[in-house]
């Protein structure tokens, strides 16, 4: 079998994605990979194939009286329910309140900060290490002073290896490669140490990893 390179259009921009289609040399059949479907597929086929998985983002900041959330992103028919759309929408919501200090590199303004990068790492790791074959929820909760990321499945590496970094054993390597192609999760095995380092630099409470 061969994985083909696919060009995906997102908001008028072309994004190169690998592992989206597969070609079987023996049968000469071509089709969408399971990872490609989950990442870039249409909402209904994604829900049909992955009826065991839900995606849910809940913002519990700035709550009004008797409100359970101030913002929520879930399956409501207003967006294509694939991982790529979920990732891009959630990362925008998670970081919209973060400060972006004015910084120039040459003549170009740099809006990214270590905190933005750490939050992207957390979301990326939640997705690539999720067990998409069991019943569960890819869930992110935003509170006034914390973020909570949860996914189905158990850790594939010992806790000590994750804390130390340098090793990666993604449960979804094809999805990991797709995210890396669009600029997320570049450094193998560095995600959690990056988060710890950033939170420590901010003198914030140490993040907790629970299996």
Regions found by a protein language model. Give the residues of each.
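Short beta-strand
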Residues: 139-140, 188, 208-211
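Glycine-rich phosphate-binding loop
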Residues: 168-203
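Active-site helix-to-loop segments that bind/position phosphate- or nucleotide-bearing substrates
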Residues: 1-134, 142, 153-170, 191, ...
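Conserved DxG motif in ATP/Mg2+-binding regions
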Residues: 147-152
């Amino acid at each position: 079998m061969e994985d083909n390179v696919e060009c995906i259009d997102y908001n008028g921009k072309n994004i190169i994605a690998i592992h989206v289609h597969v070609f079987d040399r023996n049968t000469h059949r071509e089709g969408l990979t399971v990872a490609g479907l989950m990442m870039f597929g249409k909402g209904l086929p994604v829900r049909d194939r992955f009826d065991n998985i839900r995606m849910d983002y809940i913002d519990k900041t700035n709550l009004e009286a008797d409100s359970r959330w101030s913002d929520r992103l879930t399956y409501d028919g207003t967006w294509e329910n694939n991982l790529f759309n979920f990732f891009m929408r959630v990362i925008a919501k998670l970081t919209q309140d973060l400060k972006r200090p004015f910084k120039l590199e040459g003549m170009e303004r740099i809006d990214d900060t270590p905190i933005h990068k750490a939050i992207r790492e957390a979301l990326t790791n939640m997705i690539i290490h999720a067990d998409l074959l069991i019943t569960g929820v890819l869930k992110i909760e935003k509170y006034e002073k914390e973020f909570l990321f949860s996914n189905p499945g158990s850790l594939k590496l010992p806790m000590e290896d994750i804390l130390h970094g340098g090793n990666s054993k993604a449960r979804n390597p094809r999805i990991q490669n797709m995210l890396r192609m669009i600029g997320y999760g570049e450094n193998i095995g560095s995600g959690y140490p990056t988060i710890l380092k950033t939170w420590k630099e901010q003198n914030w409470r140490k993040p907790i990893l629970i299996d």
